[in-house]
């Protein structure tokens, strides 16, 4: 067990622990294996993740409200649906990360802008000075290298669907704060944009760009093969995307990180009121990563969940 949730208004989450046998040992062994692949020249970066799980009782919408209060997500999302097995499921996402945004041309004519904002590099502020932590993150050669690799990957992906020569890096490196208090995290981000080809369909955009580079690695296909080999289960909604497409042509799709996925049974009213909560956390593995350091980074990414559900023991 990593921690136990407190009773909250509208819901309760039980003991939070690893969702698969091996837990920390399995994850750190996976990091070591990724480092072997990197040294062999197979890959430059792999985003390796593991699953935290707990029992859930109550109203998933109350959990979503708690995640919003704790994480102040810029790209949060809430979805209720029934899976292929007929089970009720909920996605409660407190995502800070933008996968894709389409901004129509302001003049009402012509083609607008397609934009992506990958994140790489995470720090919890804890008791330290926020400005000091921000300076350390901004100066971290490891985190800058992680982000630079993904910026190059996303430039390439955008180039597959945008006009020749239109892809540009609007911001190569910026530090953003997401969440407050114990849930507050500092993130290194970049912004890449381009002018999509006229007549482009969203199906073509997703075929070229999904899943996001920040949650896979580089090169993307080889990184995904390694993820499939080393992670204990399919990710499901985690690291996918939830989006909205508006009548004016604008659209915004997140990367489904910092996301609770609840699977359960229906009550007499047909609502999900109990089940299992899964919360995946991951880290970008590069040549100078250490298994211990990457494990610690993954747990920092559970801060918003811990703040939302409480941390009783």
Question: Residues of each region from the PLM?
Answer:
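Extended alpha-helical targeting/anchoring segments
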Residues: 1-313
